[in-house]
Swiss-Prot record:
This is Phosphatidylserine decarboxylase proenzyme. The keyword DNA damage does not apply. Its main location: membrane. The lineage of its organism: Bacteria, Pseudomonadati, Pseudomonadota, Betaproteobacteria, Burkholderiales. One of its GO terms (molecular function) is phosphatidylserine decarboxylase activity. Pathway: Phospholipid metabolism; phosphatidylethanolamine biosynthesis; phosphatidylethanolamine from CDP-diacylglycerol: step 2/2. Its EC number is 4.1.1.65. Its cofactor is pyruvate. Heterodimer of a large membrane-associated beta subunit and a small pyruvoyl-containing alpha subunit. The gene is psd. It comes from Ralstonia pickettii (strain 12J). One of its GO terms (biological process) is phosphatidylethanolamine biosynthetic process.
Amino acid sequence: MNNTYPHPIIAREGWPYLGGIFIVTLIVQAAAGFGWAWPFWVLTLFVLQFFRDPARAVPTQANAILSPADGRIVAVEQVRDPYADRDSLKISVFMNVFNVHSNRAPVDGTVQQVQYFPGKFVNADLDKASLENERNAIVLRRADGQLVTSVQVAGLIARRILCYTKAGEVLTRGQRYGFIRFGSRVDVYLPLTARPRVTIGEKVSATLTVLAELD
């Protein structure tokens, strides 16, 4: 395991929310005492938990495909990868509102393309969400030439996809590249030769869980 993963423990996307509610809480406590302020302290703790972004040890196996998100496996199937135009193995992770919302690179690789698609906001737990919902796809090329596509998909509640990478950049496994507020779904498209290491219904953790292995 590689434990080098510099980043804030609280996702930067949550700093404005946390700062705002913390200031309001202090004002209420100063003006009216703890009896009135305790609900605001509870809300502050909820926001703190909601935007947590804990460090993750990165597995060092060269051929491991790491989970890009915390959540539950909802699909392991052979489909067409519409972003890299190839047949592929798709593994999908559904993220609920209580999961960590950061998205991380599943492999080391160079970003070949970043594609944004407007769309619907149906329940991300449904298969049709993969191609009908608003989404953002990045295609990564490993050093051996194999392609891995990671797609952030919006959902019924999650309507804010953030992606911080662009074509030409190099990502390392476990590197934070995006964020989906209020959870949702991430689809990973792999070469057909990839061997899945997870099953439908299994809970996974971003970076820590190996989704599949490449030949």
